[in-house]
Amino acid sequence: MDIAIIGATGYAGGELIRLLGMHSAAEVVCATSRRVEGTRVSAVHPQLNGFTDLSFTNPSVDEIEADVAFLAVPHTAGMQYVRALLERGIRVVDLSADYRLPQEIFEKVYGVTHTDYFAAPYGLPELHREEIRGKHFIANPGCFPTGATLAAAPLAAFADTIIYDSKSGVSGAGDNPSATTHFPNVADAITPYKMTTHRHLAEMKMELERLHAKAACYFTPHLLPVNRGILTTAHILLRDPLNQDQVERIYKDYYKDESFVRYQKPSIAAVRGSNFCDLIVESEGKRVVAVSAIDNLVKGASGQAIQNMNLMCGFKENDGLASAGLFP
């Protein structure tokens, strides 16, 4: 099965190439870039030297020949590709935010007019597997909403309020240099940002509504001086108290068939490079604390995109994703 990665120079693009190289049926035949057309992929992603001989190309949409296309382009750029690819019979997984939210919410949150909106399944397989299976187009979730939603989903319907506190590695900001991610500003620091206004809050609220939760939802992210990982602490304030045995049983039952969710003490080091979400939960009655850890570039982006592709195309869900985390 031939794969095209549109916008392949970023961190998510590099991870797509790495992970798809371990897939039993997928071959990346096209990695696009306007900026470095003609450059070898391994010159931009040195970890892929000896792993791929591809060079970046810059074809028009009509020139792309593939069975599946991954869009790893900036937010608000995905919408210019999707319909044209679908009309040519190419399945699409969009890693941008362009189709995750209802149109009016997207336009309010991202401050742009959507020029080609239509509804797409939200690609969080642990919650929406049957909506994803066999489809031709999937909107891949954001990294923060993935870790947060998996942390809170089992108790969402019992909650009055959910407060998400997330710490993320610097790669979540992408590969464009900025003062925010400049080494002297990041090193030896944990820094909050967009404390009440982060765009991913809209996805978190949307997923809670789909879980029939009526809980108020709040979110504050922080930047960690590490490359990868998101650790999310969800403070779940319940209407009625639940003891430790009850909440553990709820979580273990909820995720008992989920191969990528592990009930164990979460650490971003233990999930690095993998598609796993590790989580644990502790109750003090009407307040439950659930903590999850994911790799923001894998379960939070490229790995989950491949998990969605596998469901779309009828492959084993863990094809290309069966590796353990890189620890230590």
Curated annotation (Swiss-Prot):
- Catalytic activities: N-acetyl-L-glutamate 5-semialdehyde + phosphate + NADP(+) = N-acetyl-L-glutamyl 5-phosphate + NADPH + H(+)
Which Gene3D superfamilies does the protein's record reference? Dihydrodipicolinate Reductase, domain 2, NAD(P)-binding Rossmann-like Domain
Catalytic class of the enzyme: oxidoreductase
Into which family does the record put it? Belongs to the NAGSA dehydrogenase family. Type 1 subfamily.
Give the active-site positions: 143
Which GO molecular function entries does the Swiss-Prot or TrEMBL record give? N-acetyl-gamma-glutamyl-phosphate reductase activity; NAD binding; NADP+ binding
Gene Ontology cellular component list? cytoplasm
Compartment(s) where it occurs, according to its Swiss-Prot or TrEMBL record? Cytoplasm
Enzyme Commission number: 1.2.1.38
Matches recorded under SMART domains: Semialdhyde_dh
Question: What does the protein in this record do?
Answer: Catalyzes the NADPH-dependent reduction of N-acetyl-5-glutamyl phosphate to yield N-acetyl-L-glutamate 5-semialdehyde.
- What are its GO biological-process terms? L-arginine biosynthetic process
Record pathway: Amino-acid biosynthesis; L-arginine biosynthesis; N(2)-acetyl-L-ornithine from L-glutamate: step 3/4
HAMAP family, A to Z: ArgC_type1
The protein's matches in NCBIfam families, at most eight in alphabetical order, are given as:
argC (TIGR01850)
State the name under which the record lists this protein: N-acetyl-gamma-glutamyl-phosphate reductase
Keywords recorded for this protein, A-Z: Amino-acid biosynthesis, Arginine biosynthesis, Cytoplasm, NADP, Oxidoreductase
